[in-house]
Design a protein with these regions (language model features):
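Central regulatory/effector-binding core of bacterial HTH transcription factors
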Residues: 1-53
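C-terminal regulatory
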Residues: 38, 50-158
Length: 158
């Protein structure tokens, strides 16, 4: 998916090009599951939980953590959720995969796993846009931490 490409390939492509100047690197980014062999690709990048049973995998990046964030202006009028069940009372910015499926927010604490079908008036298909919508005060967003590291550090997000 795009997330895997943005967070693992993008930071490495310059070093790859310098180390292997004779190799033509073509990167195709899709959110749908593609059969790497059938598609004629030499390799594929996926998030760990998306691996097929007989696929050979090599870790190329760290574990990714999700974060629920919002702008201070959003929390000026809405209470901060203390548990995922409280998300039903909030405007959530949702993610739609290219397959049409809406992402269900996934939480885990002390071995307890919860999936929430978040609700809200804004649905996007790009993590960067979701993070920016949260900064703009559109609602709560569930995004991978690297996408919101800077706005969390400078106070644009909580």
């Amino acid at each position: 998916p795009r997330t895997a490409a943005h967070l693992t390939l993008t930071p490495r492509r310059g070093a790859f090009a310098a180390a292997y100047p004779d190799i033509v690197l073509e990167i195709v980014i899709e959110d749908r599951f593609t059969d790497v062999v059938e598609g004629g690709f030499d390799a594929g990048v996926r998030l760990g939980e998306s691996l097929q049973r007989d696929m050979i995998a090599v870790r190329i990046g760290p574990d990714l953590r999700g974060a629920v964030v919002a702008a201070p202006s959003y929390f000026a009028t809405m209470p901060r959720p203390r548990h995922p069940r409280e998300l039903a009372d909030h405007r959530c910015i949702r993610f739609r995969f290219s397959s049409g499926i809406l992402y269900r927010w996934e939480f885990e604490k002390d071995g307890e796993e919860i999936e929430i079908a978040a609700q809200g008036p804004l649905i996007l298909d790009e993590d960067h846009l979701i993070a920016q919508a949260a900064v703009d005060g559109a609602g709560l967003a569930f995004v991978f931490e690297p996408y919101v590291r800077a706005p969390l550090a400078d106070g644009r997000l909580i």
